Amino acid sequence: GFFALTPALIPGWTDDVVRKDRRLAKAMIAGMAAAGAPRSNYIPGQLMVSRDTTSLNVSNVPTVTIEVGNMRNAREARRMSSAAGQREYARWLAAGIENYFASR
């Protein structure tokens, strides 16, 4: 299942955008779930907050990383490697993005 990775509050680095990052992550989670994306069963609330993801910490615009599946799960690995599954992931991600812009 999917989850969102977003930066933690780090004074001098993320403090200017962390609330917007969190809003983006929550909108992505809600939109993807509403579109039928299976949720992660190992990340509570599908939201992981991290201090050590440089690409998230240095951004000055809202940013989030979406992990769409677990390659160690055979069913998810098959979905990720098939064209039909990749279209599903694209649809779910698009639903999350649309939800973010609709909620702004």
Which positions does each model-derived feature cover?
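Active-site-proximal helix/loop segments of hydrolytic enzymes
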Residues: 1-104
